[in-house]
């Protein structure tokens, strides 16, 4: 098989995983703003935490790869996630909150992440496709600032 066919098949498989995962999530909410530093992450964390405290199975995806701050806000910056051949398992905060953040994957939490557009989008796609969110009532997404500005 040619390399381009392999990439195409891989892309189709990724799309199928993303679709399959998203179908298990009743409501997807992206907290967005056209400007940085306005409290987007704070709103996302508080919304996810409140929904989980009310008994809703909730996921929080910190897709801001340049400055993942949700782990610090939740006090779980030292918590570990499990990643194996079956995918990535988000950190759980009992009783109903699951969290995935780029912050879990960085060895140096203060080091800047400098990625170009396609790599950034690939990371976000992987967070949705490879993370085992399970059945959720809500997935709260704190997106990249660039994605927020695209929608404003």
Which residues does each predicted region cover?
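Short glycine/serine/threonine-rich phosphate/pyrophosphate-binding segments
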Residues: 38-46, 68-71, 143-151
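Walker A/P-loop phosphate-binding motif and the immediately C-terminal alpha-helix
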Residues: 28-65
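Generic secondary-structure signature for well-ordered alpha-helical cores
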Residues: 30, 53, 75, 125, ...
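Phosphate-binding loop that captures ATP/GTP phosphates
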Residues: 57-59, 63-109, 114, 121, ...
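Short loop/turn elements that form and flank the Walker-type P-loop nucleotide-binding site
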Residues: 24-26, 54, 93-95, 133-136
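Phosphate-binding/switch loop-helix module in NTP-utilizing enzymes
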Residues: 106-152
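Extreme N-terminal, non-catalytic leader segments
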Residues: 1-38, 79
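Short gly/ser/thr-rich secondary-structure transition/capping motifs
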Residues: 9-15, 81-84, 121-124, 144
